[in-house]
């Protein structure tokens, strides 16, 4: 009798919980604000990258210098906040030590997403050299396909047949859009802007730039292909007009998906779930500075330009603002992966697609063809079908994750709408010190 009474009591409690409508509580408000911040920063970043280019749709500055400065800003900010957290809770200082093999291997794990983010942040500059911003953000929806494939292959996440069908429609729509896309730097030249340099070049810099111009722009030589060479390489894809811009953005989608999935995994696995996000990001941004710094030092063209012209040569007002926007946009992504999940990050990117497309029509003289108006809605419709067909949870009350934020209190949030989060945060009983690396 007592067992029956307890079951009835539990059932009634579940019914009351299911019938309760979610209000605009603090977690919902934080989610809304975080989404708005991410959309604003992501849209601004794409526009600033485009505005910072010159008349030839190339960059007078070294794009790696933007990434180095933004990583340094994020590292300084996270270290300062981490010191406050450690001072407030002394027991967390152990996360900054590397006195054992386990701690060292745990620290080195952050180098993997840092390297992937390093590539992702660098490729975006060259994607916008070959594609209009509107086309770039639409093609970036290919990351939904790469994320789904990585979830299925790496994390064994299951998709229903409607989701697979929507991904197929998305893939075909993106392929169809390549038929009406300009992917040559020469075709997009003239969409850039004339900038006044912040620093007057020295005599040695003028001689260096003159020699570089004779060698056909040595600054970007390692990141660009000649039109003849690329057209010969891509001749087999001529029936779909596959260009270098398309290849770069497909590679970027794979890299960004892998980076976000792995970063979310180590942000939430085991005891990392309750560790301060600022301590975790300090490790990530340390490796980000290392990889970007090595690029400046090891690339002979980059090293020669810095030696002759200085670190900030070629920068303009837009590139300086871009440093700050890139830094805060990276922090917003970290907060999304820590407190929400990858799917929220992908969904917010769709709003960015609409904003950038609208701005491109108004500012960048982007004139969509009839094919664009027929195929672009198919991309957005397939994304809507993919997210609308996500299976509902069997249990009404989803699992609650408790995550520690800066104030030291615990913020509870739901993880019921993402199967990948449950898999990422599942603890393994057979973990050992040897397999942490």
Swiss-Prot record:
Membrane-side (Lumenal) residue stretches: 43-65, 130-132, 180-241, 298-316, 365-367
Residue spans of biased composition, Basic and acidic residues class: 421-430
Assigned keywords, A-Z: Antiport, Glycoprotein, Golgi apparatus, Membrane, Phosphoprotein, Sugar transport, Transmembrane, Transmembrane helix, Transport
Glycan-bearing residues: 217
Phosphoserine modifications at: 407, 429, 432
Cytoplasmic side: 1-21, 87-106, 156-158, 263-276, 338-343, 389-437
GO molecular function, one term: pyrimidine nucleotide-sugar transmembrane transporter activity
Transit peptide in keyword set: no
Chain intervals for the UniProt region annotation (Disordered): 412-437
Compartment(s) where it occurs, according to its Swiss-Prot or TrEMBL record: Golgi apparatus membrane
Pfam families membership: Nuc_sug_transp
Reaction catalysis annotation: UMP(out) + UDP-alpha-D-glucuronate(in) = UMP(in) + UDP-alpha-D-glucuronate(out); UMP(out) + UDP-N-acetyl-alpha-D-glucosamine(in) = UMP(in) + UDP-N-acetyl-alpha-D-glucosamine(out); UDP-N-acetyl-alpha-D-galactosamine(in) + UMP(out) = UDP-N-acetyl-alpha-D-galactosamine(out) + UMP(in)
Purpose: Probable UDP-sugar:UMP transmembrane antiporter involved in UDP-alpha-D-glucuronate/UDP-GlcA, UDP-GlcNAc/UDP-N-acetyl-alpha-D-glucosamine and UDP-N-acetyl-alpha-D-galactosamine/UDP-GalNAc transport from the cytosol to the lumen of the Golgi.
NCBIfam families: nst
Protein name: UDP-sugar transporter protein SLC35A5
